[in-house]
């Protein structure tokens, strides 16, 4: 469906506790606002989030922007997302960039994505990057299989690599 999509939420981490509460100075609260638009062949969204950090955790403000485009000339979707996180106090800011492509190949879709996170003010070993590749295809009307692999560089020269097989059922 095309059109505007929006949401707002308030999550109280300590809402179940009588000493924490909801939206109080004795509990942590996270407020999130989203606004997006879906059009023919494209879409985008904006996310604003804030953690007040009142108790035990560092508060932060976060901003995210994402766009996707599906050109009519090729069977693909290109997605780009940019996110920032600004913690209170002396904690280091984070910037994240994601680029993904979905391309119809044969009976399924090939997915490829790259992501990098840069931690400002910290050492380079806090920066991480990685990529993933997968292929999804339907086994029948209700089952989709998606095998894939990923690798993530932790910034210290170590890589975590894995193989994944997801099976999705629809009834």
Each predicted region: which residue ranges?
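Outer-membrane beta-barrel proteins
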Residues: 1-171
């Amino acid at each position: 469906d095309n059109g505007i999509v929006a949401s707002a939420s308030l999550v109280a981490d300590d809402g179940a506790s009588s000493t924490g509460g909801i939206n109080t100075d004795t509990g942590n609260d996270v407020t999130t606002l989203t606004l997006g638009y879906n059009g023919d062949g494209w879409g985008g969204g904006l996310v604003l989030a804030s953690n007040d950090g009142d108790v035990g955790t560092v508060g932060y403000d976060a901003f995210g922007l994402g766009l996707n485009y599906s050109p009519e000339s090729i069977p693909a979707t290109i997605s780009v997302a940019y996110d920032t996180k600004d913690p209170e106090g002396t904690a280091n800011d984070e910037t994240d960039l994601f680029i993904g492509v979905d391309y119809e190949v044969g009976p399924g879709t090939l997915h490829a994505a790259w992501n990098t996170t840069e931690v400002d003010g910290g050492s380079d070993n806090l920066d991480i990057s990685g990529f993933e590749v997968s292929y999804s295809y339907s086994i029948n009307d209700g089952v989709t299989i998606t095998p894939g692999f990923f690798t993530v560089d932790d910034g210290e020269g170590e890589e975590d690599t894995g193989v994944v097989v997801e099976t999705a059922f629809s009834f």
